[in-house]
Design a protein with these regions (language model features):
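Conserved alpha/beta-domain cores
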Residues: 1-187, 191-211, 219, 231-233
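Gly/Pro-rich active-site loop or hairpin
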Residues: 141, 239-240
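Gly/Pro- and small hydrophobic-enriched strand-loop and loop-to-helix capping segments
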Residues: 221-239
Length: 240
């Protein structure tokens, strides 16, 4: 499947929206409470700008270079942009002001570095804390038991506001197992909200991608990150 044209993207987003709404209703939730984040890794500014006319709520970027290029080119057409990839501390400055939400904070070291740069810029940066729910070495994120000290550290910051959690469960074909991982993340999300940390607002639960977004919504996701189902297969030879 090659990269889709505008008409194909339009059809894809309409189908995704229908599936999102059905999954939300199945769980007794308001479909309007779940946002669609278009994961636009490797897409050109022209493709991103074209998709901005579709019912996409927010754009998600994995690479700082692509976030900068698309943001500076106006490709998001006024819609919010989030950073959803692994963030290196030496690139934080470029993300601030371009990403309204950094979804992938996975260490106290990164948290402190964002605090430092946000203080210099005189802003309060919204973030999500990333949880490695499957304990996979190939993925970033904190172990579930390490979430609590990270929340303690985040609550003490003056220029960071925690808005929720992000997770990528292990890829598997077992539907029940997938839902168990997603349910575990939701449980952490609820527990974090109940603990009443200052400066922490459990509003956004970012989980679910092209292969499991319906399950994620059934298990409580408020934002799903979808790339290939919208845009088609990625051509990694084009961009970083």
């Amino acid at each position: 499947m090659a990269e889709k044209n505008l008409e194909q993207m339009k059809e894809a987003v309409a189908e995704i929206r229908e599936k999102m709404a059905a999954a939300a209703r199945e769980a007794g939730r308001d479909p309007a409470a779940v946002q669609l984040c278009a994961a636009c890794k490797t897409r050109t500014a022209q493709t991103v700008a074209a998709s901005a006319a579709l019912p996409i709520d927010v754009f998600g970027e994995n690479h700082v270079q692509e976030l900068c290029a698309n943001f500076d080119a106006g490709a998001y057409c006024g819609k919010p942009s989030h950073f959803i990839g692994h963030l290196q501390t030496n690139k934080i400055k470029k993300v601030l002001g371009r990403a309204s939400l950094i979804q992938s904070v996975d260490s106290e070291h990164l948290l402190n570095a964002i605090e430092k740069e946000a203080a210099k810029a005189g802003i309060v940066q919204d973030v999500l804390l990333e949880v490695n729910i499957g304990g996979e070495e190939s993925k970033t994120g904190v172990a579930p038991e390490a979430l609590w000290p990270l929340l303690d550290a985040a609550a003490a910051q003056e220029h960071i506001r925690v808005k929720g959690l992000m997770a990528i469960p292990p890829v598997n074909d077992d539907d029940a197992r997938n839902r168990r991982y997603l349910a575990e993340v939701y449980k952490l999300f609820v527990q974090a909200g109940e603990r009443g940390y200052p400066n922490v607002f459990m509003e956004t639960l970012s989980m679910g991608m092209s292969g499991d977004f319906e399950n994620a919504i059934r298990e409580g996701a408020t934002l799903v990150r979808i790339g290939t189902a919208i845009y088609g297969e990625r051509d990694y030879s084009k961009k970083v």
